[in-house]
Amino acid sequence: MTEKLQPLRGMKDLLPDDYKVHDYIINKARDVGVLYGYKQMSTPLVEYTKVFNRSMGESSDVISKEIYSFLDKSNDFVALRPEFTACIIRSLISNRLQHKLPLKFFSTGPVFRYDRPQAGRQRQFHQLNYEYIGAKGAITDADTLKLAVDILKALEIEQDTTLELNSLGCNESRSVYQQKLVEYLNDFKDQLSEESKIRLSKNPMRILDSKSETDQKIIANAPVLSEYYTDESKEYFEELIQYLDILGMKYSINPRLVRGLDYYCHTAFEFTTKKLGSQSTILAGGRYDGLAKIMGNNDDVPAIGFAAGIERIALMREYNISEVKPVFVLPIGKNNICYALEIVDKLRTENIAIIIESLGKIAKRMQRIFNENAQFIIFIGDEEQANNNLKIKDLKKAEEYIVDFAKALELLKK
């Protein structure tokens, strides 16, 4: 018996109804981005693995556990992109766009992570991604956060999310804090989860993200980053808060919200929801001024960005999306098909969506049309062809018309 082929675990087909929702989300988000000056770009699905090793760190969960990396036929290690930011910065450097800064980029498409599949978390999923490159300062961060809020509003889910906000401070702040955090955690080293024991030597701030209940109890009394802010870091965060208050934005300061990579600084944020269980993060981002230099640029480039999961957004609410309903043309006999094709072609040039139903018996064709919930059917038989007319049936009004092409056009465009 022939094996029944299935998609890979954690990867799903996007059927027309799914794609309709995805397109709606993407178009809404793109339209808001345009109002903020963002321009769309795309990068390859496949990059050299070292692009992500540099950007995310070899000890990160994504690189150590989740990345799809393999040796290609040229003996190069390549990877399916697990996120967009590294790809965008790689593109900035390889296309020598530094002289055009500042730049605002919007991207969308699939990303891949070898994770345990569950609702809202698949191994292939789709993201909206925004990067504001070459602009520094709290005003830039406030503008980026307002963009995120406006996107969620356009998608009618902002009211079901909470903006969690923190400042990672400057390099000096984080360096002092990390030292104090390690000193604190060393006293509990034997009680930490196995994963956190590994992180303690490689990336201690990531322990603050631990899902282990034991780790969380230890973390509850750990030093807080804000206690070690320099004057510069305090002023930056206070300025950001001032701008958010002026914009009337609601937020919750979460002192445990961190990023474990050295190139992140100052603003970090997440929009979370209670509607999706454990997959509570809808949109997340932060400032990453140090990434470009790590990836080979001569200098640091200030940048801030965020990504949002399309599948998770789609789970947040039901979207009633109106569609263009096609007009169906039904030639009665085989000798009517040529005339029907002429009519179909003329109507499409007038931007009317048309489907020609010519296969099978009339009853079966009519059933297929009814299943599509169509409004108009154009019948073309010998009489219509001889008189150069069209018989149009309006299924919603239960009315029938026999008209010439000009009148038919007028009727169908109402």
UniProtKB/Swiss-Prot annotation:
- EC number(s) given by UniProt: 6.1.1.21
Q: Which GO terms describe its cellular component?
A: cytoplasm
* Keyword Coiled coil included in the entry's annotation: no
Q: Report which superkingdom the organism of origin falls in.
A: Bacteria
GO MF terms listed in the record are: ATP binding; histidine-tRNA ligase activity
Coiled-coil residues are: none
Keyword ATP-binding present in the record's keywords: the answer is yes
Indicate where this protein resides in the cell: Cytoplasm
Give the primary localization class: cytoplasm
Q: Which InterPro entries match?
A: aa-tRNA-synth_II, aa-tRNA-synth_II/BPL/LPL, Anticodon-bd, Anticodon-bd_dom_sf, His-tRNA-ligase, HisRS-like_core, HisRS/HisZ, HisRS_anticodon
Q: Name one Pfam family in it.
A: HGTP_anticodon
Under catalytic activity, the entry for this protein gives: tRNA(His) + L-histidine + ATP = L-histidyl-tRNA(His) + AMP + diphosphate + H(+)
- Which GO terms fall under biological process for this protein? histidyl-tRNA aminoacylation
Q: Which UniProt keywords apply?
A: Aminoacyl-tRNA synthetase, ATP-binding, Cytoplasm, Ligase, Nucleotide-binding, Protein biosynthesis
Assembly information from the UniProt record: Homodimer.
Q: Which PANTHER family match?
A: HISTIDINE--TRNA LIGASE, MITOCHONDRIAL-RELATED (PTHR43707:SF1), HISTIDYL-TRNA SYNTHETASE (PTHR43707)
List the HAMAP family hit by this protein, alphabetically: His_tRNA_synth
UniProt lists the family membership as follows: Belongs to the class-II aminoacyl-tRNA synthetase family.
The protein depicted here goes by the name Histidine--tRNA ligase
Q: Which organism is it from?
A: Rickettsia africae (strain ESF-5)
* Lineage summary: Bacteria, Pseudomonadati, Pseudomonadota, Alphaproteobacteria, Rickettsiales
